[in-house]
Amino acid sequence: MNVSAIVVEYNPMHNGHLHHIKKTKELTNCDALVCIMSGNFVQRGFPSILDKWTKASIAISNGVDLVIELPTLYSLSSAEFFSFGAVSILDSLNIINSICFGSEIGNINALQDIASTLLEEPLEYKILLKNYLDKGISFAKARNLALVELNRDNKIMSENINKILSLSNNILGIEYLKSLLLLNSSIKPFTITREGADYKDENLHKEYSSASSIRKYLKENKNINILKDFLPLEGFLEFKRLITKGYNFSMEDSMINYIRYKYISGYKNLHNLIDVSEGLDNRIYKSLEKNFTYDSLVGEIKSKRYAYSRIGRILCQYFIGFENYDLNSLLKSTPNYMRVLASNEIGLKVLKKIKRHSSTNIYTKIPKNTNTLLNLDIKATNAYSLLNNNIRFNEDYFRSPIIIKNTIY
């Protein structure tokens, strides 16, 4: 069985994601497609607009065979740790033949060259990087300049490095490739050219609209019929069903009052979070005293040094309670389990294959004894239940994987 994998967030799933699924199947000629997906919080620093089980069900209805959860520790981490968490879980299964991701450049060789250099850090690169850093240049810019100079004999590559490293999906792709190299993985990487609007684009566009634009529309409008052109049919119908049911779409503004209450109640321990450098905690506290929306709060805190998504992840981590854990030790370890969210009949065959070839624990229900990584996921769902009326406290203990039979795609 030829098994391919994709790493996704689906916040929410749109036509661009459907294109990714179809192209992955064409490119890899796979018999089964495994999706490792962020759960109730996503890497850009938001609560997911739909809960993880609903997202997983929509994914299965649109061509994915097995959905497993990316632990919240990784889904709320930098691109480096987000990628490593996903790739290390996939690699541990010992049955994944390939991974396919979207990138703006759509050129796997160019991305692999950069990934190899950044991971191996050859002496010439180290010297160039140090020289630029000594001039007071920021790390990201110094890294780019060092790579350009290192590739000075390759005109096409040197001219495109800055462009490659300025685009988010390229950066994420490079991190996937670095993780594969670091793990000495046999998983073969593929990339497709990302189609449609930039993820920051908040305007709806014909055929391929960004997840941001769809979330913005849902936040401001009750009539969602216009979204039929931008969502897979099964996803659109699920949205309509949820609206009829009175489902609360989880929006980041809903989280802010809980965060403000936590702060004024005396929980001033942001400094325990990895991404909170000296002084950033006080900057956040001051902003919490006078800002009541996510955008105004993050907008006041962000700077050239502190990116929007980094601040968003910090707020989500604080909301969940990450500051009470030894995050450094957790991020240095590798996951020893996979959590199944949804499957079809092909996915069940994949699970049987994993059981034969891997020692990774497969969780379809929460075990009596949970490790720290899984405990964080449970805390994340409990925090998320404050934002989403469809999710109960301790929902993780009540839910079994969604099994959808006879899906034809």
Swiss-Prot record:
Disulfide bonds: none annotated. It catalyses: cytidine(34) in elongator tRNA(Met) + acetate + ATP = N(4)-acetylcytidine(34) in elongator tRNA(Met) + AMP + diphosphate. ATP binds at residues 7-20, 102, 169, 194. Its EC number is 6.3.4.-. Keywords: ATP-binding, Cytoplasm, Ligase, Nucleotide-binding, RNA-binding, tRNA processing, tRNA-binding. Pfam families: HIGH_NTase1. Belongs to the TmcAL family. HAMAP family: TmcAL. This is tRNA(Met) cytidine acetate ligase. It comes from Clostridium botulinum (strain Loch Maree / Type A3).
